[in-house]
Structure formats: C-alpha cells, structure tokens
C-alpha cells in the first residue's frame, strides 16, 4: 500500500528547494516582520472552549482521499461564512498538488475576517515557517509523523520566534509521547491515518484521555455531526478541526452554527 504521507513529504522537499531557489531567507524574514500583527490562535480556542466548543473551521477545496470537495471555492466568502457561523479560528490548506490549495487562499481568507488563521500544510523546513508568517499565518501545523524530534523542536522554535502559535498533530501513542516534549499548548489528535488516509473516531476516543492536562486538546478529522463532537468531548476534547463536512454544506454559516449548537458540558 502506498504511504501517502511519505509521497507528500518527498514532494515537499522538492517544493522547499524551489522556494529556496527563488527567494532568500532575508527577503522572507523582512516580509514576515512587516506582516499584519499575529492574532492569538491558542487564545481564541481557550476562550471559546471555556464556554462551549472551540472550532477550527477549515477551507479545503480537495483532498487526496476524497478528490474535489467544493467546486465553488471562494476563500473570502467561505471565511466570512465560518466567522458568521461562530468559528473560533480558520485553517486554510495551502498545498497545491494534493489539496488544490494555494498560499493566496490564506491571504484572501485572513483579509476577509478577524479570526486567527492556521496555515495547513506539511512543514519540514524553517523557510516554510518564515514564509507562513509572511503570508499572514497566525499558527502553523507540525505533523509528528512527518518529523523527527529535533526538527519538530526547531520548527516550533522558529514559529515562536515570529510570534505564531503551533498546532502539534499526533495519530498514535508514540507520537503523543514525542509531542508532549514540545512547548506548544495546542495538541491535536488526528482520527485520520495520514499514511493510509483511513479514518476512525476510535483513535480520538482512545488517545484524547492521555493528553497532558495542561494542553488544549483538539480532535481532528471524521467529524460530521454533533454526536461525533459529543463523543470526542466525552474523551476530553473541547476543540475541533472540521473541514469536509462544512465544506460540503450548501449553507456553510448555518452548518457551522448547527455543529456548534448544544455543546456537551465539560
């Protein structure tokens, strides 16, 4: 069986080399330092999850497993719909090849709203982190399955140097143990196996209770109904990253309100 994550990471190395060949660290650093001030991503989730659910609403046009998810994909209008529906933060896919995303999608989405924005991509090099801040990202994603401990710590440190938050993503107990050594309070449990793209909510149900209590637990992938959120909440999550189910909705704002309604008491 093809290891989807490994294939994507191989391509990311090519993309990083191309980026390094077309722009310098100094140029990106200057742009990052001149970018719009960082919006507190972790703070927004902590605030909203204290009184209900915290939602990272994702702008995702397509995926390797599902193909095209939303044809009428306008980042600005979708971002506004999410904000109107009560999302705490946004996540924007910027990978072109596998998710039909684009860095400019993040720029357009962030300019349209006041919400903090996560750059959802496969981070393997400090240059990508600086580029993310230059684009306006408030948070970056670190996928433990794609990184060794030293690189994960380095990328986290660079993100912190630029004032960004960091979402650390795990899929199994070994990755969770490694992630707990990092400093970020944001820890996501992905119900999707990125090597096979298979999804099971059993992953979150089993792993969420093991997260360090001083971290903000975020359940990711396979969340389609309030009952799905309730199951993850029972395991310890008050925050959720949801993309596909909301992207497929005719009325994105209404779907966002529905998924957030009647949160299970903590």
Where are these regions (language model features)?
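An N-cap/entry alpha-helix motif that binds or orients negatively charged groups
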Residues: 2-70
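Catalytic cores of alpha/beta
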Residues: 124-135, 171-182, 219, 223-242, ...
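Glycine-rich phosphate-binding active-site loops on the catalytic face of alpha/beta enzymes
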Residues: 131-151, 189-196, 235-256
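Structural recognition of alpha->loop->beta junctions
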Residues: 76-88, 181-193, 236
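Active-site beta-loop-alpha junctions enriched in small/polar residues
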Residues: 11, 58-62, 95, 122, ...
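C-terminal helical cap(s) of enzyme catalytic domains, especially alpha/beta-barrels
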Residues: 206-210, 233, 248-266
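N-terminal active-site wall of soluble small-molecule enzyme domains
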Residues: 53-54, 59, 65-167, 173-178, ...
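Catalytic-face loop-and-helix region of soluble metabolic enzyme cores
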Residues: 186-242
């Amino acid at each position: 069986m093809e290891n989807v994550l490994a294939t994507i990471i191989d391509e990311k190395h090519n993309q990083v080399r191309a980026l390094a060949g077309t722009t310098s660290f100094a140029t990106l650093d200057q742009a990052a330092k001149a970018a719009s001030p960082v919006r507190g991503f972790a703070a927004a989730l902590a605030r909203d999850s204290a009184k209900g659910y915290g939602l990272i609403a994702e702008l995702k046009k397509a995926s390797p497993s599902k193909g095209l998810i939303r044809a009428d994909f306008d980042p600005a209008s979708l971002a506004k719909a999410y904000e109107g529906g009560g999302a705490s933060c946004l996540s924007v896919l910027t990978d072109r090849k596998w998710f039909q995303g684009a860095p400019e999608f993040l720029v357009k989405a962030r300019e349209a709203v006041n919400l903090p924005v996560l750059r959802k991509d496969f981070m393997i090099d400090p240059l990508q982190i600086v580029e993310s801040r230059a684009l306006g990202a408030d948070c970056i994603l670190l996928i433990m399955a794609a990184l060794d401990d030293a690189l994960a710590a380095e990328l986290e440190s660079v993100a912190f140097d630029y004032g960004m938050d960091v979402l650390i993503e795990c899929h199994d107990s070994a990755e969770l143990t490694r992630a707990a050594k990092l400093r970020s309070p944001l820890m996501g449990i992905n119900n999707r196996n990125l090597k096979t793209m298979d999804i099971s909510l059993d992953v979150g149900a089993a792993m969420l209770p093991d997260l360090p209590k001083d971290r903000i637990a975020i359940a990711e992938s396979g969340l389609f109904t309030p009952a799905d959120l309730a199951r993850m909440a029972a395991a310890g999550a008050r925050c959720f990253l949801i993309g596909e189910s909301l992207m497929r909705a005719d009325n994105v704002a209404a779907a966002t309100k529905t998924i957030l309604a009647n949160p299970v008491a903590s």
